[in-house]
Amino acid sequence: MRGTAEMIANLDPSVPLIADADTGFGGSLMVHRTVTEYIRAGVAALHLEDQPITKRCGHLSNKQLVSEEEYLSRIRAAVNARCRSNGDIVLIARTDALQSLGYEEAISRLKGAIELGADVAFLEGVASKEQARQVCEALKPTPVLFNAVPGGVSPDLSVQEAQDLGFRIIIFPGLALEAVSTAVRSAVKQLKETGTQPVRAGSSPRDLFNVVGLQEAVALDHAAGGKLYEKGV
């Protein structure tokens, strides 16, 4: 996870990266290590949740939860890791308690996390616009994050709608994955049925390499007086 986070964070360090830290990958010591490693990787923010290590997607049913005490221990470990590392990583406290334990328990967990030093609250599985507005109001002035998952248990909100309800951060975890999955499925189906692969404008090897930094590599080599690309690419 640290390696992947570091690779993404350093594609463009000027763009802040929010990373999923799941459960912290273990007890308080592992949470401490996870947060420390994410800080060293250049991650700008992470979210930490209250499911057990054998967790499931927040938009599936019958999720299990750890106790509030264990959850807050994770948050405390994350805050301590940030202090010890002299980092400024933003800590997002997530709870999945809404579905099984109800609204009041979920809010209690988030308020406890905020008291310990969490910077942002994340109530997974908000069930309606009314509930969304309610949680944003209940946790003021702490920023609240909305998880935009089309077809999930939460309402489909535009950026403007989410802002109007009081959310201050929105994540779109399936945006790229769903687009890529659909495109790959279509391409493989065409190959299987016709024996040919899709050919689209702007899909040459050079175009792909440009997306992943070919021109930046050329510029860096040229600036250093290198000759790797002097005859072109």
Question: Predicted segments — roles?
Answer:
Residues M1-L175, T182, K189, A223-V233:
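Alpha/beta enzyme core
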Residues L177-V233:
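Extended, intrinsically disordered, low-complexity segments
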